[in-house]
Amino acid sequence: MALPTVAIVGRPNVGKSALFNRIAGERISIVEDVEGVTRDRIYTKAEWLNRQFSIIDTGGIDDVDAPFMEQIKHQADIAMTEADVIVFVVSAKEGITDADEYVAKILYRTHKPVILAVNKVDNPEMRSAIYDFYALGLGDPYPVSSAHGIGTGDVLDAIVDNLPTEAQEESSDIIKFSLIGRPNVGKSSLINAILGEDRVIASPVAGTTRDAIDTTFTDEEGQEFTMIDTAGMRKSGKVYENTEKYSVMRAMRAIDRSDIVLMVLNAEEGIREYDKRIAGFAHEAGKGIVVVVNKWDAIKKDNRTVAQWEADIRDNFQYIPYAPIVFVSAVTKQRLHKLPDVIKQVSQSQNTRIPSAVLNDVVMDAVAINPTPTDKGKRLKIFYATQVSVKPPTFVIFVNEEELMHFSYLRFLENQIRQAFVFEGTPIRLIARKRK
C-alpha cells in the first residue's frame, strides 16, 4: 500500500536539506552493497510514532539555471501536486523575505495541510523571532534548529497529526504494475498499446494522494490489473517534467505504489545509468521486475541480436538475474500480447508459499552440497528455515549465531532455493536469526 508523502519547500539556504536529513535519520546515508543501488537524496522513507511516510526534498529537484522565483514556484507546484503534507521552511536569522511571502501565497491555494517550520532557531534568545512569521498566515510557526536537532520532534508530531488516515487494504486480487523508464523510451506509446489490446477498461481511478489517474483493466481471462500512473504534473511543469531528478522521483513514487515494475529500455539507445539506478531501487523495494526492451522494430537485427541484448542486460543488471526480458514494439504491437501473461507469472511468483518441510529439505540438501562456513573455529549451524511472508517471498533461517552467516553463503542458499522453486521476476529475502 502506498505511503503518504511529505514535501519540504522553501527558498535556498533556509536549511531544507538539513531538516530533510534530520527527519530521514540514518536512512539517507545508506549505500547498498550492490553496485548501482543507492538511495536518492531527494526521496526517502521516514518513520515517527509508528507511522511511515515518504519524504521529498523539493530543493533537490531545482533546475539551477532557472530564474530564482521560477525555481521556488516549481518547488511549491511539486509539493501541492505530490504531497499529502507540506513543510514550509523559513529562516529565523533572515526573517520574512519576499520569496517567503511569494511561496506562502502559492501555498494558500492548496487544501493540503502546511506546517511552517522556522529553522535556525539555534539558541533560546532567537525564539522570539518566530512570532513575526504569523504574518504569513499559515498558522503556528514551529521553532527548529536542524543543525542541533532541536524542535524536529514537534515538526514530526505535526506531520503525523496531519497525515491521511491509514486506508483499508486494497484487494489483493488486483495486480498493480507501472511502466518505468527514461523519457523517450516509449512509455506512453506502450501504455496506449497495452490498453488498446481489446481490453475492458473498467474505470479511471483517482490516485489516493494526488491528482494522478490510475487505470484498471481486465484481460480475457478475467484477471484485473491496475496500471499505476507515472505521467507527472499536469500543471505548467514545462521543462521540469523531463529533468532527470524529477523523473527519478516520479519513478520512485510509482515503484512504491506498484506490485510489479516494468523497466522499459529503448532498443535504439541501450542501457544508461538511470536505468540501473531505478532497477536497483525496485529491487531494493522488493518489487517484481520485468525488463521490457521497447522499439524493437526500430533496430537492425541478426540471429545474434537477442542473445547479445540479453547478455548486456544481465551484465548491467547483475542484481536482478531473476527478471524476465521481453522484446516489444509499441508501434507494431510485436509481443505486446505476452506482457499480461508475464506480469501474471511474476505475481504468482511473488505470492508463492513454500511448505516448511519442503523448504527445509532444500536447505539441508544445500548444506550437504556446500557445508556451512566457520569463523575462528566456530561453525555456522542451521537448525531450520520457514517462510514468513510474500511479496517478496521472505524466509527466516534459524541458526546458532547470526554473525557466522556470511552474505556469500546466504546468496548460495538463495540460489539453491531459486533452483528448486519458480520465483521468476521477484526478489526473495533470506534473513538469518539466532534460535532462542
Curated annotation (Swiss-Prot):
The keyword Repeat applies. It comes from the Bacteria. Keywords: GTP-binding, Nucleotide-binding, Repeat, Ribosome biogenesis. Disulfide bonds: none annotated. GTP 1 binds at residues 10-17, 57-61, 119-122. GTP 2 binds at residues 181-188, 229-233, 294-297. Residues 4-167, 175-351 form the EngA-type G domain. GO terms for molecular function: GTP binding; ribosome binding. Residues 352-436 form the KH-like domain. Coiled coil: none annotated. One of its GO terms (biological process) is ribosome biogenesis. The keyword Hydrolase does not apply. PANTHER family: GTPASE DER. Belongs to the TRAFAC class TrmE-Era-EngA-EngB-Septin-like GTPase superfamily. EngA (Der) GTPase family. Associates with the 50S ribosomal subunit. NCBIfam families: GTPase_EngA, small_GTP. GTPase that plays an essential role in the late steps of ribosome biogenesis. This is GTPase Der.
